[in-house]
């Protein structure tokens, strides 16, 4: 029987998420609600907890209050067994300064690693939508003998220019790691696809500590995990790529196996929601064998009255649809859609109300928005452009607490 390694999870959750504005005006990107019942951070935490990695530090910085509260209310583990998920803001142990990058966040938090003394460290991002069994990646890392392993997802070469791209040999060793190249490299077995980094890493502990310390002494570094630490280890011949398509998650369907989305823009965030709503969704939220855990509020069930209906939609607990039509949309908890209103192809966050006879199309409404009776959002983009953010793809985004 193989010895069970001691693994510490570090989740990088300090992202500001400027491209998701106005959704990040009052919260960190990992705290943005998603999918009717979750926050973005719930996906990485669910993956780690499902794999029984139960000692997790979440490094936070930007407008972290709602993120900290969400973790403390919904992610309590058994302290008696030494299990924890703890938010860790910048401690300023090394002087009065904030994190200057993801690698610097770990450098300033090295005490967490020394205290836990793990064999391996899982360093994952906090703002992607996916299912993954990290234990399989840890086993790959151990068997490969690498000091660092980068999770790579296959994308068509022509679509890879916006990502950090990985060039690996037949054994999986990374030969080069390049951010946003004009000519992305092919994979060893398919020249038409490219491995792009998912922002998920496994490190042997000493390798990470040595690399982080060396990076901290480099005045020319941006102190970024993907931009500085990984290239440093690639140059030393110590990095391998883990093919995400090899990851087998219990209960996965053929459609959502190897699903992963970077939701860093309004259009990507919107599109990922539309992946949830069909009868056979591109990403299935209802996999009981690998559950995504989210809000644990005690709410009444959703209710449909006076002929109200929802088709190809996700409707959260506590919501009421009254003589209204909801189609191809995701509604979070405590949403009210009043008589005669129409909601189509939209994402509605908790506590929002769509008034009598109002129309909302191709839009994202943040928490506690009120759309007045007869008002329209997403119908006249020129009018909307004067008062709301509109994405490159024409998605109208309305900020938190706005009355229309």
Curated annotation (Swiss-Prot):
Deleted gene: phenotype: Inactivation of glgC reduces by half the extracellular (capsular) alpha-D-glucan and intracellular glycogen contents. Cells lacking this gene are not affected in their multiplication or persistence in the BALB/c mouse infection model. Combined inactivation of both glgC and treS results in a complete absence of maltose-1-phosphate (M1P) and alpha-glucan, whereas combined inactivation of both glgC and otsA results only in a complete absence of alpha-glucan.
CDD domains, A to Z: ADP_Glucose_PP, LbH_G1P_AT_C
The keyword Transferase appears for this protein: yes
Pathway: Glycan biosynthesis; glycogen biosynthesis; Capsule biogenesis; capsule polysaccharide biosynthesis
GO cellular component, one term: cytosol
GO molecular function terms listed in the Swiss-Prot or TrEMBL record: ATP binding; glucose-1-phosphate adenylyltransferase activity
Matching InterPro entries: ADP-Glc_PPase, ADP_Glu_pyroP_CS, GlgC_bac, GlmU/GlgC-like_hexapep, NTP_transferase_dom, Nucleotide-diphossugar_trans, Trimer_LpxA-like_sf
Protein residues bound to alpha-D-glucose 1-phosphate: 99, 164, 179-180, 197
Keyword annotations from UniProtKB, A to Z: ATP-binding, Capsule biogenesis/degradation, Carbohydrate metabolism, Glycogen biosynthesis, Glycogen metabolism, Nucleotide-binding, Nucleotidyltransferase, Transferase
Enzyme Commission code: 2.7.7.27
A GO biological-process term: capsule polysaccharide biosynthetic process
Catalytic reaction annotation: alpha-D-glucose 1-phosphate + ATP + H(+) = ADP-alpha-D-glucose + diphosphate
HAMAP family per the UniProt record, alphabetical: GlgC
Entry function: Involved in the biosynthesis of ADP-glucose building block required in the biosynthesis of maltose-1-phosphate (M1P) and in the elongation reactions to produce linear alpha-1,4-glucans. Catalyzes the reaction between ATP and alpha-D-glucose 1-phosphate (G1P) to produce pyrophosphate and ADP-Glc.
Family as reported in the entry's similarity comment: Belongs to the bacterial/plant glucose-1-phosphate adenylyltransferase family.
Miscellaneous comment as given in the Swiss-Prot or TrEMBL entry: Maltose-1-phosphate (M1P) is generated by two alternative routes: the TreS-Pep2 branch and the GlgC-GlgM branch, however it seems that TreS-Pep2 branch provides most of M1P for the GlgE pathway in M.tuberculosis.
Name the record gives this protein: Glucose-1-phosphate adenylyltransferase
């Amino acid at each position: 029987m193989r010895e069970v390694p001691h693994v510490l999870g570090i989740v990088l959750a300090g992202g500001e998420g400027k491209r998701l504005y106005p959704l990040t005006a009052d919260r960190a990107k990992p705290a943005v609600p998603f999918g009717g019942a979750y926050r973005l951070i719930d996906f990485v935490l669910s993956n780690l907890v499902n794999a029984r990695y139960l000692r997790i530090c979440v490094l936070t910085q930007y407008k972290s209050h709602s993120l900290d509260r969400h973790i403390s209310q919904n992610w309590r583990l058994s302290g008696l067994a030494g299990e924890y998920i703890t938010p860790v803001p910048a401690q300023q142990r090394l002087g009065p300064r904030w994190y200057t990058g993801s690698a610097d966040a770990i450098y300033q938090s090295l005490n967490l690693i020394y205290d836990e003394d793990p064999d391996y460290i899982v360093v994952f991002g906090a703002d992607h939508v996916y299912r993954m069994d990290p234990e399989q990646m840890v086993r790959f890392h151990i068997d490969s003998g690498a000091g660092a392993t980068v999770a790579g997802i296959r994308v068509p070469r022509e679509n890879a220019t916006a990502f950090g791209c990985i060039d690996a040999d037949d054994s999986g060793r990374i030969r080069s790691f390049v951010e946003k190249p004009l000519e992305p490299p092919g994979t060893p077995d398919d020249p038409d696809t490219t491995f792009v980094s998912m922002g998920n890493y496994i490190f042997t502990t000493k390798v990470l500590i040595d690399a982080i310390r060396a990076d901290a002494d480099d005045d020319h570094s941006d102190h970024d995990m993907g931009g500085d630490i990984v290239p440093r280890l690639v140059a030393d011949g110590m990095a391998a790529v883990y093919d995400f398509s090899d990851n087998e998650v219990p209960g996965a369907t053929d459609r959502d196996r190897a699903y992963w989305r970077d939701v860093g823009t309004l259009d990507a965030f919107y599109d990922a929601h539309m992946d949830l709503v069909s009868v056979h969704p591109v990403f299935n939220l209802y996999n009981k064998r690998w559950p995504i855990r989210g809000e644990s509020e005690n709410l009444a069930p959703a209710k449909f009255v006076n002929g109200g209906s929802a088709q190809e939609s996700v409707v959260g607990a506590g919501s009421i649809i009254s003589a209204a039509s909801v189609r191809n949309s995701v509604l979070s908890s405590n949403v009210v859609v009043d008589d005669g209103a129409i909601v189509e192809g939209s994402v509605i966050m908790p506590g929002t109300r769509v008034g009598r006879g109002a129309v909302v199309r191709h839009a994202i409404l943040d928490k506690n928005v009120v759309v007045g009776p007869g008002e329209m959002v997403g119908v006249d983009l020129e009018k909307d452009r004067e008062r709301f953010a509109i994405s490159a793809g024409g998605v109208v985004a309305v900020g938190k607490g706005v009355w229309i």
